[in-house]
């Protein structure tokens, strides 16, 4: 068939900001698609709202629009660009929904735009529950017995027919709010009632529960000529009942008999053919472990999180092939880019085991409900490759960077019998470690199977790990056991721990006996054909397949799994570094373990090592490759934390020297530097005990900001206003890290300003200054950032520029630098300095046109800024105003307080850019998912300290036609100011009260500022959660509310009566 010649211009829709359930895998898919289409000579137009992506780089498409992914804006782009075709299946759920909306609004028909790849009716057949069930019945494919109900009686009738347990899924609620598993009548009444209450159409789907069945996924591809293949099949270690995005997954499946494998394979191919999908598709099965009965759980007619995992697990580039199928190619016309000799119609074969473990945000959200169910909670994931299940699994565990290196977690080990068993029966993020502990306590495989329904094959594998632990403990220094432990994925650190010696000694013992890993290639064909790709994993075997070349090389450390505080921004910088290293004539080698990202695409670097980011794993690669040095500036805190350990082992760290990094990160050394440079910072001191903390706070005066030293994303930071709050914090936070003291600073109120700079040690170039809308005290990652600054006078800008240059020179920075200042009264004080790439690099690079990561890398490799065309100073400001708006995933995490503070909570970001601040903000807020009604009611519940400030906001809302609602205290003050206000009952008063108003949809905006004291039971917390769960915009910072008001004022007309004639 070949490619279609009748289309010239194609619009690709991205997936927008990173939220729980839709992470970096779509940047990887979108980037691949754009490259594939450009390769074929098509004109590519890309629209996406997320600036932290590689796909929104101007080199990726012919034209890039960073605009909100809404009907209004995408239609406008279609009108301007008039594309021939649109490719929505690479933009996740967002892209699919957009395509459906464009079609329903008649836009596609009006402008004659063809949907490429999977057709609309196929999308709807897979996505709509009723249509999907009908199709499965037609194909004779079993789906779980289910029914749609509107009353509790109907639920009883259903249970009488199928029996317990059942699953309740409310209609039109986000992420299964109100639903759950029902085991008995008591559950039934509670869950169905709550489900019907939460569903806006009072409707639930009840289905026979198949929790406990094996969950198996097939990743399939089909082309327009009806060729279909299975790229990869995967097995969830956690049985059905836990969302696949929250499950530990292995590929290929480990426990299926050949008959089961073929049965499910045939079924998945039959389904993709019946749906007429052209491209990639993911089919999820539930399989009864005791018979050949299976059910279809769901089908995703698009590239998904699983396809990113399948691509990295097999080396088969699903998104790239899907894009080519969309423009008419067939599988047997496309070469497999890994082997470059076989065709894409050849099913991949694996001679290794891949494990994926999710990374959850519970370290940031202590109060969140940690249990895992049908609603996804993980922010990211890690993947590891090994030659056996144990090796693969243990490598994945130590890739998580959650302070665990083995099936061993101190908190879990201290649990009593009852709590431990509860963790096994009701899964949460620590179940894997609970299994390890249970085996240590002597639980049998059968007992564990009864508690968890995890297949006995996996349980035996965990038991093998624990058994080896015991043998190591009893035989200190045994070389045979050491060899076996390394083959099974044990790290030196754990072996040293069991032997009571140091990691270094275990390492030396191995080196003396020639025990070090070899690197095997991922080649899609189990080494059947020769392969051209440089994609490797380490394992303890005989033959090494990774050859060192003659070219000088540089090793780049990636940033690991996506989590709050360390998002896709760092992967963006990593990819740019790799490209710059290649441009500078070196070989670029990357080490990373996140299957979702562009950096782990085998075509990004010259060599890719898919390995954990630990000292041991990185050192093995350094020993083999002998690079000129290692770059750690772009991998976030992950890479920075490895720097000193690597340097201690003689590795050259490229860029800012270690002792200079330490001068920026270590409190006392940093203060000394600031004093020498005569740059002011807020008063502060370091406390090592509770008593000392009390004295410091008393001396510098409340409010104070307290935090542990060395953190990313402000973990465990808090602003405290009085002594009892301080003592309460110290009791919880000093435990964060006893070796590291706690920092206590005077909390200065004022505007926060952020500066990114590039320095070669002498020359300093400043691409841009950003002004934060939220005052200091809200984490910079959770603030709306504006570029260029709108309210900063020229004289203050000069001061910022001078201080940034002095700091960069004073700290001898080589590479990137990020500084946060607070503008208090008439001066700017330094809050913190990060001697590395920061999360604003992608945003600033895009809005200023300065390729920051690229320039910084070349500087680190020895060029000076003037040689690259940059003199010391400030980059000319752009005329357009751009805003970076944070995006949160609160709807997916129940019990989490949404108040903004010094601890970061956002998972992603979007950008809005226009001629004025108001227009840019409108785009940014809309793109972040906020709905902005132009009339209705605003509910104020304000803390005493903010009441004066809230008056002017209420007045302005009233002037543009909003009704004002408020609780008694606030209402009284507004009334005195002559603002008409309706008083609403507090939660403790009789109904209807505050929460009823929010539930009934009678408030369009809720503005609620925090009353001190953090226990979630407080009214404020309930108000904020109720807003999130009912999709009402809730603002916890008056600054954000003011920004929203400016937008509303600019899009609504004022209605002022005429002045009275004199």
From Swiss-Prot:
Domain MGS-like: 930-1062
Binding site for Mg(2+) 1: 284, 298
UniProt: Mg(2+) 2 binding residues: 298, 300
EC number: 6.3.4.16, 6.3.5.5
UniProt: Mn(2+) 4 binding residues: 832, 834
CDD domains named in the record: MGS_CPS_II (cd01424)
Chain segments carrying region Allosteric domain: 930-1062
GO cellular component terms, semicolon-separated: cytoplasm
Pathway as given in its UniProt record: Amino-acid biosynthesis; L-arginine biosynthesis; carbamoyl phosphate from bicarbonate: step 1/1; Pyrimidine metabolism; UMP biosynthesis via de novo pathway; (S)-dihydroorotate from bicarbonate: step 1/3
Cofactor: Mg(2+); Mn(2+)
Binding site residues for Mg(2+) 4: 832, 834
Cofactor note: Binds 4 Mg(2+) or Mn(2+) ions per subunit.
UniProt subunit comment: Composed of two chains; the small (or glutamine) chain promotes the hydrolysis of glutamine to ammonia, which is used by the large (or ammonia) chain to synthesize carbamoyl phosphate. Tetramer of heterodimers (alpha,beta)4.
Family to which this protein belongs: Belongs to the CarB family.
Listed PANTHER family: CARBAMOYL-PHOSPHATE SYNTHASE [AMMONIA], MITOCHONDRIAL, CARBAMOYLTRANSFERASE FAMILY MEMBER
Name this polypeptide is given: Carbamoyl phosphate synthase pyrimidine-specific large chain
Organism whose genome encodes this protein: Halalkalibacterium halodurans (strain ATCC BAA-125 / DSM 18197 / FERM 7344 / JCM 9153 / C-125)
The gene coding this protein: pyrAB
């Amino acid at each position: 068939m070949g490619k279609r010649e009748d289309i010239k211009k194609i619009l690709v829709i991205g997936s927008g900001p990173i939220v729980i359930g839709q992470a970096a895998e779509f940047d990887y898919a979108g980037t691949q698609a754009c490259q594939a289409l450009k390769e074929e000579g098509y004109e590519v137009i890309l629209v996406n709202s997320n600036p932290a992506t590689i796909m929104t780089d101007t080199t990726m498409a012919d034209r890039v629009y960073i605009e909100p992914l809404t009907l209004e804006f995408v239609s406008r782009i279609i009108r301007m660009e008039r594309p021939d075709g649109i490719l929505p299946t690479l933009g996740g759920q967002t892209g699919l929904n957009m395509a459906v909306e464009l079609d329903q609004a008649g836009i596609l028909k009006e402008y004659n735009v063809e949907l490429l790849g999977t057709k609309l009716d196929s999308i709807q057949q897979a996505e709509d529950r009723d249509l999907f069930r009908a199709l499965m019945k037609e194909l004779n494919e079993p789906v779980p017995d289910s029914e749609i109900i509107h009353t509790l009686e109907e639920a009883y009738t259903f249970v009488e027919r199928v029996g317990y347990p059942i699953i309740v899924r409310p209609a039109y609620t986000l992420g299964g709010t109100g639903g759950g598993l029902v085991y008995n009548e008591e559950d039934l009444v509670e869950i169905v009632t709550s489900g019907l209450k939460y569903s806006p159409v009072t409707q639930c789907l009840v289905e026979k529960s198949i929790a406990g069945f094996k969950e198996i996924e097939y990743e399939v591809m089909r082309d327009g000529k009806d060729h279909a293949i299975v790229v990869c099949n995967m097995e969830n270690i956690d049985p059905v009942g836990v969302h696949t995005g929250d499950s530990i997954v292995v590929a290929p499946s480990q426990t299926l008999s050949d008959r089961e494998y073929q049965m499910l394979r045939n079924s998945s191919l039959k389904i993709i053919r019946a749906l007429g999908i052209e491209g990639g598709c993911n089919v999820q099965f539930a399989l009864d472990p005791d018979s050949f009965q299976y059910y279809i759980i769901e089908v995703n007619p698009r590239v998904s999180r699983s396809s990113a995992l399948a691509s990295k697990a097999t080396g088969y580039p699903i998104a790239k092939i899907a894009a080519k199928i969309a423009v008419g190619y067939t599988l047997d016309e496309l070469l497999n880019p890994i082997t470059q000799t076989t065709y894409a119609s050849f099913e991949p074969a694996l001679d290794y085991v891949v494990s994926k473990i999710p990374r959850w945000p519970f370290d940031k959200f202590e109060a969140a409900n940690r249990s895992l169910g049908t609603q996804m909670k993980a922010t990211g994931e890690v993947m590891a490759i090994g030659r056996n299940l144990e090796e693969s699994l243990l490598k994945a565990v130590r890739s998580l960077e959650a302070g665990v290196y083995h099936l061993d977690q101190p908190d879990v080990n201290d649990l009593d019998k009852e709590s431990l068993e509860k963790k096994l029966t009701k899964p949460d993020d620590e179940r894997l470690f609970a299994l390890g502990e249970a085996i240590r306590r002597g639980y049998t495989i059968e007992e564990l199977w009864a508690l968890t329904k995890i297949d006995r094959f996996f349980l035996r594998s965990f038991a093998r790990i624990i058994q080896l632990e015991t043998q190591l403990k009893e035989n200190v220094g045994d070389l045979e056991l050491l060899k076996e432990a390394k083959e099974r994925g044990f790290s030196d650190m754990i072996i040293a721990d069991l032997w009571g010696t140091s990691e270094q000694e275990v390492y030396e013992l191995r080196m003396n006996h020639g025990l070090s890993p070899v690197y095997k290639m991922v080649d899609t064909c189990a080494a059947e054909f020769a392969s051209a790709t440089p994609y490797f994993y380490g394992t303890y075997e005989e033959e090494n397949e990774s050859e060192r070349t003659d070219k000088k090389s540089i090793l780049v450390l990636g940033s690991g799994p996506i989590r709050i505080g360390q998002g896709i921004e760092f992967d963006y910088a990593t990819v740019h570094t790799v490209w710059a290293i290649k441009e500078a004539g070196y070989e670029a080698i990357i080490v990373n373990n996140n299957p979702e990202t562009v950096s782990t695409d085998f075509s990004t670097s010259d060599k890719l090592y898919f390995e954990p980011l630990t000292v041991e794993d990185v050192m093995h690669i350094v020993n083999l490759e002998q690079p000129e040095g290692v770059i750690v500036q772009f991998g976030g805190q992950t890479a920075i934390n490895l720097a000193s350990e690597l340097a201690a082992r003689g590795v050259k760290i490229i860029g800012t020297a270690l002792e200079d990094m330490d001068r920026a990160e270590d409190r006392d050394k940093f203060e000394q530097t600031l004093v020498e440079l005569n740059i002011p910072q807020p008063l502060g001191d370091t406390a090592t005990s509770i008593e000392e903390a009390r004295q410091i706070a008393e001396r510098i005066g409340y409010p104070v900001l307290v935090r542990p030293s060395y953190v990313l994303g402000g973990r465990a930071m808090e602003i405290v206003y009085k002594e009892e709050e301080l003592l309460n914090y110290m009791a919880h936070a000093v435990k964060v890290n006893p070796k590291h003291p706690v920092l206590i600073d005077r909390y200065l109120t004022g505007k926060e300003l952020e500066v990114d700079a590039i320095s070669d040690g002498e020359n300093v170039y400043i691409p841009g200054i950003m002004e934060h809308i939220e005052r200091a005290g809200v984490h910079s990652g959770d603030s709306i950032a504006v570029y260029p600054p709108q309210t900063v006078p020229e004289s203050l800008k000069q001061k910022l520029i001078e201080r940034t240059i002095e700091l960069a020179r004073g700290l001898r920075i080589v590479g990137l630098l990020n500084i946060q200042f607070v503008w208090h009264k008439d001066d700017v004080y330094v809050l913190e300095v990060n001697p590395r790439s920061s999360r604003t690099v992608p945003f600033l690079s895009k809005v200023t046109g300065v390729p920051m990561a690229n320039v910084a890398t070349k500087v680190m490799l020895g060029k000076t800024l003037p040689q690259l065309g940059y003199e010391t100073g400030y980059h000319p400001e752009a005329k357009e105003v751009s805003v970076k708006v944070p995006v949160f995933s609160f709807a997916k995490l129940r019990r989490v307080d949404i108040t903004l503070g010094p601890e970061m909570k956002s998972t992603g970001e979007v950008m809005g850019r226009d001629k004025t601040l108001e227009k840019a903000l409108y785009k940014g807020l809309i793109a972040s998912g906020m709905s902005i009604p132009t009339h209705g009611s605003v509910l104020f519940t304000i803390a005493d300290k903010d009441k004066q400030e809230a008056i002017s906001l209420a007045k302005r809302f009233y002037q543009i036609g909003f009704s004002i609602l408020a609780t008694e205290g606030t209402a009284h003050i507004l009334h005195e100011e002559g603002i008409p206000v309706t008083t609403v009952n507090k939660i403790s008063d009789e109904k209807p009260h505050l929460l009823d108003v929010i539930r009934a949809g009678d408030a369009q905006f809720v503005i609620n500022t925090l009353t001190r004291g953090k226990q979630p039971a407080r009214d404020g917390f309930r108000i904020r959660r109720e807003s999130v769960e009912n999709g009402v915009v809730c603002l916890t910072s008056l600054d954000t509310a003011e920004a929203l008001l400016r937008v509303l004022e600019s899009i609504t007309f004022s209605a002022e009566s005429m002045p009275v004639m004199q």
